[in-house]
UniProtKB/Swiss-Prot annotation:
Parts of the chain that traverse the membrane: none
Gene this protein is translated from: RLN
Similarity comment: Belongs to the insulin family.
SMART domains: IlGF (SM00078)
Name used for this protein in its record: Prorelaxin
Removed propeptide positions: 34-133
Function: Relaxin is an ovarian hormone that acts with estrogen to produce dilatation of the birth canal in many mammals. It bears mature young, and allows separation of the pelvic bones.
Subunit structure: Heterodimer of a B chain and an A chain linked by two disulfide bonds.
Cited PANTHER family: PRORELAXIN H2, RELAXIN
InterPro entries on file: Insulin-like (IPR016179), Insulin-like_sf (IPR036438), Insulin_CS (IPR022353), Relaxin (IPR022421), Repro_Hormone_Insulin-like (IPR051042)
Compartments reported by the entry: Secreted
Length: 160
């Protein structure tokens, strides 16, 4: 079929085909969920985390951070997320409060570290850690094979 046809492509053409194939798989244009699982094989998860879920997770993390702020700081937060000029008006109030700047820095750093830890675990859970050496090595293998001997679209789809 379409996915099993051997193609020999290099450079930009390979990148275009990979974007096309991966885009179709990720957006669901090419197949249904069961077919995605069959194409990608049982070793990889075919479930995709939509960006709307990412936004909800970010909002939830922000709300949890706000909930854990000292009452004095929470009282200064506006109803909606402030823009940069709006934040500037709170700087004098923070400096005059009895909350030490060092304490505030500790709270902020702790929240940032927690957020980074959570984001890495989410990426691992969804097999989306695109920065891993294994993923980079796999991509290099795909380009070498497709350019030198040819490969199937299914082989390219497995690297998405």
């Amino acid at each position: 079929g379409f996915l099993d046809k051997v193609i020999k492509v290099c450079g930009r053409d390979l990148v275009r085909i990979k974007i096309d194939i991966c885009g179709k798989i990720l957006l669901g244009d090419m197949t249904t969920g069961q077919e995605k699982q069959r194409i990608l094989g049982s070793g990889q998860s075919a479930e995709i985390m939509p960006s709307s879920i990412n936004k909800e997770v970010d909002s939830l993390n922000m709300l949890e951070s706000i909930a854990n702020l000292p009452e004095e700081l929470r009282a200064m937060l506006p109803e909606k997320q402030p823009s940069s000029p709006q934040l500037q008006q709170y700087v004098p109030a923070l400096k005059n409060s009895n909350v030490a700047v060092k304490e505030l820095n500790k709270i902020i750093r702790g929240r940032q570290e927690e957020a980074e830890d959570n984001s890495h675990s989410l990426l691992k859970d969804f097999n989306l850690n695109i920065y891993s050496p294994k993923k980079r090595q796999l991509d290099m293998t795909v380009s070498e094979k497709c350019c030198q001997v040819g490969c199937t679209r299914r082989f390219i789809a497995n690297s998405c």
